[in-house]
Amino acid sequence: MTDKTSLSYKDAGVDIDAGNALVERIKGVAKRTRRPEVMGGLGGFGALCRIPAGYREPILVSGTDGVGTKLRLAIDLKKHDTVGIDLVAMCVNDLIVQGAEPLFFLDYYATGKLDVDTAAAVVTGIGAGCEQSNCALVGGETAEMPGMYEGEDYDMAGFCVGVVEASEIIDGSKVAAGDALIALASSGPHSNGFSLIRKILEVSKADVQQPLGDSTLANALLAPTRIYVKPVLKLLKNCEVHALSHITGGGFWENIPRVLPENTKAVIDGSSWQWPEVFNWLQKSGNVETYEMYRTFNCGVGMIIALPQAQVDAALALLKAEGENAWLIGQIEQAAAGEKQVEIN
């Protein structure tokens, strides 16, 4: 008779105890993000959240996103504390362009072998992003999947729900010729274009620890995505805003037209700002054409706001008081049928 070894889940590469240890580590992170509308704490099968008081006809707005291959660079450089901020930013910034106030956030974290310290650093960043956007971290999923990911490599996705008054939804329908365009500065490449960034690093054989401006190339590339929630929501309460465009994958050419009516175009003054040094480095080191730069990267512009010319001074003053680097970047003009909807002069 042959003895059979008793196998466990841990023998198969899944450590339930490590998962439980992670949950204990991050309970305080979630607690710091709590909103009064949230019912209960972590650990339930689902998270419960009331609609905030004061809404007459509340509309829920949802969004989901990831961080893309910025994670590969972060993993290689063992910098896990800010990619969680990136994850939240990519989701909540997409909500506010429709006028929505973020309510709650959930994350999905998948790895081949769960490293509790790494995962806790990532989730701490998620908590920081939620605090910046006044959004409650109400739950998530940690999946340890041996054979699906190499070693301690990981991937993650975020999911966010917000709310907006039905009469205050921003959909670009009010955009008209004559509207002004205000830019909000980005903190760097944010979370887009990293497959090209990594290719440039490979081809140029660059040392990511080389000095760049006041810091290093690595720090410039991994700077967390700027979260615009609080200043933009304050702007929406105080100024008339016709559209907002989050400059993400697809850059200027693809994101601005998403909020423009037919027969209008955005005319951008390319001399109204200087690209941050990291974008000049990327263009030079990768010999990237300017059109491709504007197609792949934000080039220093994280968000663009369309509003009436009469609102420009008040909007700029408010945004600067909120700590944003904001400037007049262009205007909306009439466009002929079939004409491209974005010009950069």
UniProtKB/Swiss-Prot annotation:
It is found in: Cytoplasm. Keywords: ATP-binding, Cytoplasm, Ligase, Nucleotide-binding, Purine biosynthesis. Its main location: cytoplasm. Pathway: Purine metabolism; IMP biosynthesis via de novo pathway; 5-amino-1-(5-phospho-D-ribosyl)imidazole from N(2)-formyl-N(1)-(5-phospho-D-ribosyl)glycinamide: step 2/2. Its EC number is 6.3.3.1. Transmembrane segments: none annotated. It catalyses: 2-formamido-N(1)-(5-O-phospho-beta-D-ribosyl)acetamidine + ATP = 5-amino-1-(5-phospho-beta-D-ribosyl)imidazole + ADP + phosphate + H(+). PANTHER family: TRIFUNCTIONAL PURINE BIOSYNTHETIC PROTEIN ADENOSINE-3, TRIFUNCTIONAL PURINE BIOSYNTHETIC PROTEIN ADENOSINE-3-RELATED. This is Phosphoribosylformylglycinamidine cyclo-ligase.
